[in-house]
């Protein structure tokens, strides 16, 4: 019996079996394909549709998903759909050196500290009139969180070393692969900042849950890698692409394809041209129940959310499936894998 996400071959064609929950995601704005917003995955289509609906509003947005799932792509699309005339600016908060994080974000006045030889506006002012993506927002140091809260509350920013705040008009989009609510409970992320940032929460699915999109992603990424038109893949190479779990998601796929194009030298891509982990991936086997103590961080978060929604909906699998944007059978599959009994949440 096929399960959601299973890949199979028929003749010269590869197929992926996907179960769809009821309902339509809604049409995306014109030009969405050019932005990279193409998918067969119902959950991802629903996420993009929700972003398109809130784009012209002031509703805050948090993008959640594993590294490489396309959070920056989604934020950039939100910016385009919003119609804001200013620039789109993305910053990886985890890559900001803590001593310089304030000046990088909020700007600095000349002479504020040793080495501040000139005025710098900072990324917040640079994105005024547009959209600022704070990727990995959970990594912000506590002092920076306080100043960011003021920006969101007062629509103004005070550069380091300046007593005079500057008015700004920007939309802040937060993105993270971590559980922000868990960080709040742990005391490492401010509760008031979390409340300010959180409005629409969008979860972007990992590539292993949307293998059906490989047929869209591979040609687009090959063009980006400068592959010759009509580049062919051997059946073994294509089979490996569908078999691999892609733990680092689209970013990993892009690197794998770039390597294969370079090694193929303009000829057909063979299995040996793919990265070793991809070409040596084992054949899929039926998924056995997982010991919760051995789950990855991403699966632990999914299990936690699944339990919370089952509790909220009294064990109603269909309601949980609708809220998560997946098919009912996918919820049943997760329940088996994560050893969660929906019946235990139903009233006696």
Describe each region flagged by the PLM.
Residues 13, 136, 174-179:
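A short beta-strand-to-loop transition that corresponds to the Sensor-1 phosphate-sensing loop
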Residues 66, 75, 82-86, 143-145, ...:
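Nucleotide-binding/hydrolysis machinery
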Residues 36-50, 298:
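N-terminal pre-P-loop "Q-motif" helix
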Residues 50-115, 125-141, 169, 206-212, ...:
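Conserved post-Walker A coupling segment in P-loop NTPases
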Residues 9, 255, 290-348:
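Bacterial C-terminal helix-turn-helix
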Residues 1-40:
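C-terminal boundary/linker segments immediately following FHA domains
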